[in-house]
Amino acid sequence: NEIIIENASLKEFLMDLIKNLGRGEVSTVSAITKRIYQVYRYLTNFNFPGKSRKNIEHHYDIGGARGEKLYDIFLDTKHRLYSCAYWKEGTKTLEEAQQNKIDHIVKKLDIKEGQKILEVGCGWGGMAFEIAKQKKCEVTGISLSKNQIKYCQEKAKQLGLDNQVKFELIDYREAKGHYDRIYSVGMFEHVGKKFYNIFFKSINNLLKDDGLFLLHT
């Protein structure tokens, strides 16, 4: 994964690439560079479990407790949801908008009391906690972020929901059991195109015959 530039500078190399942008004919250097990049992207785009873990850790597990403070700056304070909010008419705060989204998803899933629920990509657990409280059901949340799982487990104890909601540090391909409802919100972007089929097959294997799956992406 190295490029060695001889008898020139990095600036000259980059300027040569820029000069060729938009041209019908590109220089040999530009063509070779483009091909190298294409091969690199192809080889590194295989999102196997180990690679997925590294990607998630790089994005979410930044600086330990200090990293958590970064997310505190822009996430809603009540649920700590990272995905987009639902700003329906009359909504005034981010907290209200995220609650709108939770209520909308819960309604779509048609969750019944006592059902087993799986959240793929649970984030900081806000949606799992809300569903458990609203519907009195058993919720399992999975994530590849150590920081998120630690936060979720501690929060579950604080809320007195640790006997109803559990969180596991596993990949979706490693999940076990059968669930009445499965949902995934804002996580599908991490899957990678080459693994779409594997993702849906994994969900299908985890879903009961009469179950429902909701994908928000």
Where are these regions (language model features)?
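Conserved Class I S-adenosyl-L-methionine-dependent methyltransferase catalytic core
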Residues: I4-K108, K112
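A short acidic, Gly/Pro-enriched loop at the edge of an enzyme's catalytic core
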Residues: R173-I182
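Conserved SAM-binding loop of SAM-dependent methyltransferases across substrates and taxa
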Residues: W124-K136
